[in-house]
Curated annotation (Swiss-Prot):
3-methylthioaspartic acid sites (modified residues): D89
Coiled coil: none
Identification of the protein by name: Small ribosomal subunit protein uS12
CDD domains: Ribosomal_S12 (cd03368)
Pfam families with a match to the protein in the record: Ribosom_S12_S23
Taxon lineage: Bacteria, Pseudomonadati, Pseudomonadota, Alphaproteobacteria, Hyphomicrobiales
Organism: Beijerinckia indica subsp. indica (strain ATCC 9039 / DSM 1715 / NCIMB 8712)
Assembly with partners or alone: Part of the 30S ribosomal subunit. Contacts proteins S8 and S17. May interact with IF1 in the 30S initiation complex.
Keywords per UniProt: Methylation, Ribonucleoprotein, Ribosomal protein, RNA-binding, rRNA-binding, tRNA-binding
HAMAP family: Ribosomal_uS12_B (MF_00403_B)
Entry's family note: Belongs to the universal ribosomal protein uS12 family.
Length: 123
């Protein structure tokens, strides 16, 4: 416990808050261009081939974004929109790619939670 004179000499400092999606620069979404589209495997108890893309954002940052849903049409040079939101079992993946926006198509034959996957209302 510091004395009063020690606190006068060197006051307490507020702990710096670490942003979760810092490359978005306080924006809800950002546009970017895919530089590499590939699959990766998740952390220990899980097993799958998760689809991810390395994206160069308009502000110059390069981030890894997760491609949600079944099947996608992304390839190198596709223009995508990303949002914040990490994938718990993929280290380093802190962003999601939005489906149904710009070059990314929505998920086909999606009946529930369609707005999350950019799917149109079925007839």
């Amino acid at each position: 416990m510091p004395t009063i004179s020690q606190l006068i000499r060197k006051p307490r400092h507020e702990k710096a808050y670490r942003e979760k999606a810092r490359h978005l620069e306080a924006c809800p979404q950002k546009r970017g261009v895919c530089t590499r589209v590939y699959t990766t495997t998740p952390k220990k108890p899980n097993s799958a081939l998760r689809k991810v893309a390395k994206v160069r954002l308009t502000n110059g940052f390069e981030v890894i974004g997760y491609i949600p849903g079944e099947g996608h049409n992304l390839q190198e040079h596709s223009v995508v929109m990303i949002r914040g939101g990490r994938v718990k079992d993929l280290p380093g993946v802190r962003y999601h790619i939005l489906r149904g926006v710009l070059d990314t198509q929505g998920v086909k034959n999606r009946k529930q939670r369609r707005s999350k996957y950019g799917a149109k209302r079925p007839k």
